Structure formats: C-alpha cells, structure tokens
C-alpha cells in the first residue's frame, strides 16, 4: 500500500464501500517509507502514517498489515496470507504461525508497486553488492548503511537518488558509474559517464570495483559496498493468474499488466508502470473512482497531496560482457553464460530457457532475474524482448507454509468414522 494504494483506499472509504487494504509490510506506505521527498510539505513517511490513521477511523475499512495477496482465483476470490507470529521471537500462545484468508470481492485494485532489477557483471555475487533501492531503504528507513564508502552502478536516474540520499546521511560516495554517456553530472560525487563495472575485488567481502571508461581505460574504485540499479519491473504477477499475457512497455523497458487479466481487477501506481509519486496518486484515485461508480457508489473528487512528478530517465542495459561468471539468478546460480549455452543447445523459447537453466524457478519466481535472461535471449536470437515473450506466473506470489493451507477440517473432521446401521 504505497501512494497509489493509500489514495485508492481513501477514495473507497469515503464512498461507504466495504474496504480491505492488505499490505505485506508491517508498516503501510510502500516506497514512501524509504524515500526522503515530501508530500504536502511533510515527509512521505508522515503522510503515509496520517493517511493510515485516517483510514483506521472508518468503520467500513479493514487494514491487514503483514498480509500478502498470494493468488487471484475465479469469481473475484483472492487468497491472502497473514503472517501472525513469524516476526515474533516467542510466538503468542494459541496463535497460528500464518492464516490463509479467502476474500470475496466485487471489485479489486492492485497497487503492488515495482521491483528493482539488477545489472549482471563479472563477480557480482560478492558480499556487499546489493540493489541500490534496497540500500536506500536501509539508510532512510533503518539508519543502516552496508559501508561508509559506497559506489553506485546504474543505467537510470533512480540510482543517483541513492547516491544523493546516502551522501546527505554522511556516507562517502566513491563514485557513480552510469552507463549513459549523457548521465547527469553532480557536485556531490564523481560521475563516470559511459562507464561499466567489469569486475569486483575482495576476499571476504567487497573492497573495490574495476570500472571501464569510454576512452578504453580502466579505473579502480575503493568501496565497501556497491548499489546496482538496472531499472524497475512492475509487480504484475496477480494479473497473470488467469493466464493473461503481460504487455511490453518501451518507455520503462518492462512488462506491464495484460489486457485480459482477472475480471474485476484494476491496476494502479508503479504496478501499472507509473513510476512518479504524482502519477501513482492520480492513478490510484482514478481507478478506485471508476470501480466504485461501476458498483453504484457515489464518490467525491479526491484531494491529493502535492508530490514530486519527475520522470526517471533510463537507458535499457542488462549485462556487461565478460569472460567469467556473471549471475542473473543468484538463488538458483544461473549465469549469463548459462543463457548463452541454452541458445547454443537450441533452447530458444522462454519455456525451454526456463527449464534448461532453472531461471526464474527459485522461490522468488524470477522477480529480479527474468528480465535479464529474456534480454540476453532476445539479443542472441535477433529478436526484441516482446517477441521473445515471457512466462507467466502462478500462485502463490510468495512462499507459503503448507500448514496455512491445511484448513479447519482435519483429523476426524476431515475423514469421519463411518458406522453401519447395526452400530
């Protein structure tokens, strides 16, 4: 429940409709909890908190934190997994670990945000290398930094946001390596425009990175952590649970929700490909208003906060050419070389690629790795990424304990003893 979800929930709450707002985080707000920009002259964190408090005041609203919508099923039914005691050191007596809810809806709105994707390069599995957005979240939300000297490798403006935020918190920025020749310059840190990270160094953790520059020379940047940003992918998984095929969007170089998604499901915010805060707020309020009016509810024009609306510029870039291993899927140890070998073995469809390499078959279902693999296969086959296509997703959206599916009919209630009339 980021800006789109909160804006949509507020519109729905004021209409009188029965509303359930589910968020997998314990603190609603989405990326607002990890950013430093303001809404209506207050921090994004404070705006999210005040909005949640307002939603709590409505009798027709049910807030469900620590709850993930894990599947979209027939007739507007959704499965929701509530984590009751996973976060507790000592679980509460008589409380389950997780609860599986079945939610029956007339209309639903997906505001699941987006997931940052990496760039593959040699030895990118060394401790200290992480996504730039995650690094920003640790710093802004938890006041934690992986190192006092950080470098950034990016193909988009969002990577620079991480450098700016870390610099403001007193972290030394060793440099921002931006693959774009027209990368924005900065007075706060050095920008290596047109550069690429070609190797990393360090025995027990990252100590430095090797960077190639446009003039053909190499440089070594000393750093204890490297933030990587290759762009963002909308979280569209639920929209494909009814076999809908994602649609490619050139503007963000990512797949967006299918036209033939689950009936009654609308999408807003970053999940729709709108990556600005202003765009997320507007799309959330708009989609909620349209859904409510279709159900016969009267709505008022949403009063939205002023927010930043700068579009993040990005140049698609998926991997750095090299000789040694560059990981795409770090959970299943799938490398760039594995995808190339798959092509050499004549496995050219995405379904064959997935099964030959196990790309995207880990518990995250390829949330960070699939796009890189598809881009490499497209390059090898001389096709575009939408021509190569993508596999679709299935429930559950996140790993779920088998016990949550057990239900209430167990033991004798599941298989009662049958007796003959003589008994």
Kindly give the residue locations of the regions a language model identified.
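Residues forming the flavin
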Residues: 1-423
């Amino acid at each position: 429940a980021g800006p789109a979800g909160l804006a949509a929930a507020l519109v729905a709450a004021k209409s009188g409709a029965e509303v359930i707002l589910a968020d997998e985080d314990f603190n609603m707000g989405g990326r607002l909890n990890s950013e430093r920009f303001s809404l209506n002259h207050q921090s994004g964190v404070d705006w999210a908190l005040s909005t949640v408090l307002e939603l709590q005041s409505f009798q027709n609203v049910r807030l469900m934190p620590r709850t993930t919508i894990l599947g979209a099923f027939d007739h507007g039914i959704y499965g929701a997994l509530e984590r009751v005691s996973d976060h507790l050191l000592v679980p509460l007596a008589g409380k389950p670990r997780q609860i599986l809810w079945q939610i029956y809806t007339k209309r639903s709105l997906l505001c699941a945000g987006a997931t940052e994707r990496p760039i593959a390069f040699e030895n990118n599995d060394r401790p200290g290398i992480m996504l730039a957005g995650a690094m920003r979240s640790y710093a802004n939300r938890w006041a934690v930094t992986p190192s006092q000297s950080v470098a950034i490798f990016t193909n988009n403006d969002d990577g620079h946001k991480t450098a700016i935020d870390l610099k403001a918190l007193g972290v030394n920025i060793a440099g921002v390596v931006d693959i774009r020749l027209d990368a924005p310059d900065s007075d706060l840190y050095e920008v290596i425009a047109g550069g690429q990270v070609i190797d990393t160094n360090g025995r027990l953790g990252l100590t430095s990175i090797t960077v190639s520059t446009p003039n053909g020379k190499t440089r070594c940047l000393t750093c204890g952590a490297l933030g990587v940003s290759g762009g963002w992918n909308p979280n569209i998984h639920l929209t494909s649970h009814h076999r809908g095929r994602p649609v490619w969007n050139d503007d963000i170089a990512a797949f967006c929700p299918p036209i033939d998604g689950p009936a009654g499901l609308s999408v807003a915010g970053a999940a729709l490909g709108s990556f600005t805060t202003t765009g997320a707020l507007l799309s959330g309020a708009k989609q909620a208003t349209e859904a409510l009016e279709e159900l016969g509810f009267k709505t008022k024009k949403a009063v939205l906060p002023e927010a930043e609306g700068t579009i993040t510029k990005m140049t698609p870039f998926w991997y750095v050419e090299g000789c040694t291993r560059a990981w795409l899927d770090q959970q299943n140890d799938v490398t760039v070389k594995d995808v190339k070998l798959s092509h050499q073995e004549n496995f050219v469809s995405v379904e064959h690629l997935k099964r030959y390499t196990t790309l995207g078959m880990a518990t995250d279902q390829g949330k960070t790795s699939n796009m890189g693999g598809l881009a490499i296969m497209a390059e090898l086959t001389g096709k575009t990424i939408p021509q190569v296509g993508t596999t679709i997703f299935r429930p559950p959206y996140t790993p779920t304990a088998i016990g949550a599916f057990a239900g209430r009919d167990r033991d004798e209630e599941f298989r009662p003893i049958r007796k003959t009339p003589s008994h």
